[in-house]
Curated annotation (Swiss-Prot):
GO terms for cellular component: plasma membrane. Residues 1-2, 55-76, 122-125 are cytoplasmic. It comes from Salmonella typhimurium (strain LT2 / SGSC1412 / ATCC 700720). Disruption phenotype: No change observed, indicating that it could be not necessary for the Ara4N addition to lipid A and polymyxin resistance. Translocates 4-amino-4-deoxy-L-arabinose-phosphoundecaprenol (alpha-L-Ara4N-phosphoundecaprenol) from the cytoplasmic to the periplasmic side of the inner membrane. This is Probable 4-amino-4-deoxy-L-arabinose-phosphoundecaprenol flippase subunit ArnF. Heterodimer of ArnE and ArnF. Its main location: membrane.
Length: 125
């Protein structure tokens, strides 16, 4: 049950990260606070994505709390790294997120996936 909550948390956090990325590419820079606040007031797709991303992180925290009640921290923490994989892949596949493929990034993703699999391998008796 803990793994399920962990995977739900990772999926929601990944969607939240993608939403925030979408919003930040379209809203005015935070370096210009008045323009940024004005952009928030426009309540367009970017503003909606910003608030959806923030809400997603909040929901993800509740799922993560459920995860930590039922799964060892060493295993739960390994699940978090799957978010990097999901965001990397989604940023390349979804239009407008400007993700770029590189062999270096692919090697990093493969290392993350191998590490998670090693942690979740059944222990030898």
């Amino acid at each position: 049950m803990g793994v399920m909550w962990g995977l739900i948390s990772v999926a929601i956090a990944s969607l939240a990260q993608l939403s925030l990325g979408f919003a930040m590419m379209r809203l005015p820079s935070i370096a210009h606070p008045l323009a940024f606040i004005s952009g928030l007031g426009a309540f367009n797709a970017a503003t909606l994505a910003l608030f959806a991303g923030l809400a997603g992180y909040l929901v993800s925290v509740f799922c993560w709390q459920k995860t930590l009640h039922t799964l060892a921290l060493s295993k739960a923490y390994a699940l978090l790294s799957l978010s990097y994989v999901l965001v990397w892949v989604a940023s390349m596949l979804l239009p407008g997120l400007q993700g770029a493929f590189s062999l270096k990034a692919m090697l990093g993703v493969l290392c993350i996936m191998a590490g998670v699999m090693l942690i979740f391998l059944p222990a030898r008796s």
